[in-house]
Design a protein with these regions (language model features):
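N-terminal intrinsically disordered, cationic/polar leader segments
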Residues: 1-123
């Protein structure tokens, strides 16, 4: 069976960046991805989350279509809430080297337990 165009795009997903048009000032970029999914590494059941990214860019900004495809690439991947949130933080940091970054994984309740993971450059 031939892969559909969306599945092909997701399988080739790679984060990309663009030049920041306003490097002379600090400003916040808020991105929300409300349909994030990955697989629980213990059970294999899907985990659903809202991923929130807030950053102050330096020289680069993230290209949004590449971010969407990158985030969708986790849907069949077994990874914990903590690991995926930290991986997103690390990958975005490596790509953009922002002045400030916070990544939040706000996961839907499972077994009546809700998890929110927050990783930030601020201590």
């Amino acid at each position: 069976m031939t892969k559909k165009y969306g599945a092909k795009a997701v399988s080739k997903a790679k984060l990309q960046r663009w030049p920041n048009p306003n490097t002379d000032r600090d400003y916040n970029i808020d991105i929300e991805f409300p349909e994030f999914t990955c697989l629980c590494p213990r059970s294999g059941y899907p985990d659903f989350a809202v991923i929130k990214i807030n950053y102050v860019p330096d020289r680069y900004i993230v290209e949004l279509k590449s971010l969407k495809l990158y985030l969708n690439s986790f849907r069949d991947r077994s990874i914990s809430h903590e690991s995926v949130t930290n991986l997103l933080f690390d990958d975005i940091t490596k790509l953009l080297k922002p002045r400030r970054l916070e990544v939040t994984g706000d996961f839907n309740p499972r077994g009546n337990v809700k998890t929110v993971i927050r990783v930030s450059t601020e201590e």
